[in-house]
Structure formats: C-alpha cells, structure tokens
Amino acid sequence: MERGHEFEPEARDLYTFQTGAHLERVGFIRNGRVGCSPDSLIGEDGGLEIKTKLPHLLIELILKDEFPPEHKAQVQGTLWVTKRQWWDIGIYWPGVPLFVKRAYRDEAYIQRVATEVDRFNGELDEVVAQIRRRSEAVAA
C-alpha cells in the first residue's frame, strides 16, 4: 500500500503524458449509501485507478494485455457509484512501461453488486435497530 502511494504521482504524470488527459483529483464520492475514493476523474465520463505491481507481475500483465480480474469489483463499483461510462486502470513500476487498460460499465455485474450491497445495507439496518432498541431498554 505504501509503495502504491509512493509511486502514484509518478504514474499519474506518466498517464497524463501518454494520454494527454486532464486528471481531476477528488476525495470520497458518495452516491446514496455507497461511496468510493477514485484516484482521478477524467472529463465527464471517465476515471483512473492507479495500482503498482512488482516488475515480474507487471511484465506478465503487459504480455497478457487483459484487464486484471482482481480489480474488476473495485472498478465496476466505482463506475456504479460515479455513474461514469469508462474507467482506466494504470499499473506502474519504475522502469517498466505503464500498463493502461480501459473498462466499460458491465451493467449486469453492477446490478449484482447493487443487489448485494442493498441486501447488506438491509441487514446492517436491522443490526443497528436491534442495538438501538437494546440501548433504549437499558436507559429506561
């Protein structure tokens, strides 16, 4: 995690240089009861998530030239929360080419995530209500 934060500015600058995109850094974005903290927004429709991988893993990824499946949930969740249409993942290690792959909204996947998040929030609401009832009973 520290490594990622250390290299993030360098990766962001390299992405900007390669793509010409204007990156808007933002904090936590809320959409109802869900939220995310993307690395950058791009224009009206896109965004960027920056990751680091050790050189041997990054080279493997470059050779496969596929969106890394271990980041699908995060990126699709971010697309859901931000209501954006596409999201780039930039994976970096100094001295290795920046790997960039774009993901587009997968509506079926997003719907499954939304259903599970709604289910979880319902369970959470019930737990909170039970705790409140118990604390009110103790206070009475």
Q: What is the role of each PLM region?
A:
Residues 1-140:
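Accessory terminal regions of nucleic-acid processing enzymes
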